[in-house]
C-alpha cells in the first residue's frame, strides 16, 4: 500500500487575508477538499486544519496551517510526524513572486525564493526535498516592497482570473498525485 500524501496549502488565517496573493494555497486546498467531499477540521496535535480522503488509490491528508505564513513549519512538521509522511510525500501549494501571474509550475526541492512560509517548512522538515505546486503572482510594480505586495488583495482584473487559476492549480495537484512529478510536469508546464 502506498504511503499517504500530505498536501499543504500555505496562507494566513483570518478574513483580513482571505483574498490576498499570499493565500492562494488555502484557496486551492479548499478546492481539493471540495472535490474529495472532505471537510476541514482542527487537528489538535498540530493546530492546523486537516481534511482526509483518497485519490488515485492513496490516502490524502489536506492541511491548512492556522498560524501565520512565516510559522507554517511549526504545524506542518508535527503533521508529517503524526501521519508518518516522509518529506518526499509532502506537496506544498504556494504563491510565487518569481512566476508570471497565473503561471503554474511543479518542482521538487530548490530554494525558498524569499518565501518565508517555505523557509519555515524547510526548517521544520530539515530538507528542501518536498514537492511544490507554485502559483505565479508576478513581481510587485515599481519599487513596491514584495512583503507588502503579497499581503495585498488582487487587482480587479487579476481577481477575475483567480478562480480559473486556482482550479488549474487544483488540477495540477491532482495530476501530481495521480501521475507523479515528471509526467505531471510535462502536462502542466505545457499549459
UniProtKB/Swiss-Prot annotation:
Query: What InterPro entries does its record include?
Result: Pept_tRNA_hydro, Pept_tRNA_hydro_CS, Pept_tRNA_hydro_sf
* Sequence positions that bind tRNA: 17, 68, 70, 116
GO MF entry, a single one: tRNA binding
Copy out the induction comment.
Answer: Constitutively expressed (at protein level).
Site residues by UniProt (Discriminates between blocked and unblocked aminoacyl-tRNA): 12
Consequence of substituting residue 166 to A: Complements an E.coli ts mutation
Question: What are the recorded Gene Ontology BP terms?
Answer: protein quality control for misfolded or incompletely synthesized proteins; rescue of stalled ribosome
| Cellular component aspect of the GO annotation | cytoplasm; plasma membrane
Function description: Hydrolyzes ribosome-free peptidyl-tRNAs (with 1 or more amino acids incorporated), which drop off the ribosome during protein synthesis, or as a result of ribosome stalling. Catalyzes the release of premature peptidyl moieties from peptidyl-tRNA molecules trapped in stalled 50S ribosomal subunits, and thus maintains levels of free tRNAs and 50S ribosomes.
Spell out the family assignment given in the record's similarity comment.
Answer: Belongs to the PTH family.
Name it.
Answer: Peptidyl-tRNA hydrolase
What is the source species? Mycobacterium tuberculosis (strain ATCC 25618 / H37Rv)
Q: Which gene encodes it?
A: pth
Amino acid at each position: 500500500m502506498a504511503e499517504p500524501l500530505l498536501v499543504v496549502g500555505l496562507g494566513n488565517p483570518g478574513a483580513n487575508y482571505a483574498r490576498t496573493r499570499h493565500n492562494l494555497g488555502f484557496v486551492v486546498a479548499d478546492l481539493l477538499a471540495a472535490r474529495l467531499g472532505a471537510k476541514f477540521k482542527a487537528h489538535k496535535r498540530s493546530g492546523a486544519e486537516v481534511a482526509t480522503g483518497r485519490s488515485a488509490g492513496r490516502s490524502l491528508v489536506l492541511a491548512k496551517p492556522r498560524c501565520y505564513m512565516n510559522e507554517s513549519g511549526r504545524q506542518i512538521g508535527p503533521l508529517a510526524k503524526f501521519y508518518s509522511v516522509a518529506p518526499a510525500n509532502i506537496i506544498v501549494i504556494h504563491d510565487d513572486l518569481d512566476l508570471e501571474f497565473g503561471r503554474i509550475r511543479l518542482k521538487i526541492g530548490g530554494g525558498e525564493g524569499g518565501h518565508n512560509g517555505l523557509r519555515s517548512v524547510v526548517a521544520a522538515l530539515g530538507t528542501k526535498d518536498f514537492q511544490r505546486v507554485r502559483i505565479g503572482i508576478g513581481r510587485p510594480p515599481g519599487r513596491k516592497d514584495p512583503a507588502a505586495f503579497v499581503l495585498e488583495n488582487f487587482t480587479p482584473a487579476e481577481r477575475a482570473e483567480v478562480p480559473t487559476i486556482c482550479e488549474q492549480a487544483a488540477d495540477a495537484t491532482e495530476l501530481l498525485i495521480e501521475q507523479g512529478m515528471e509526467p505531471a510536469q510535462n502536462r502542466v508546464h505545457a499549459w
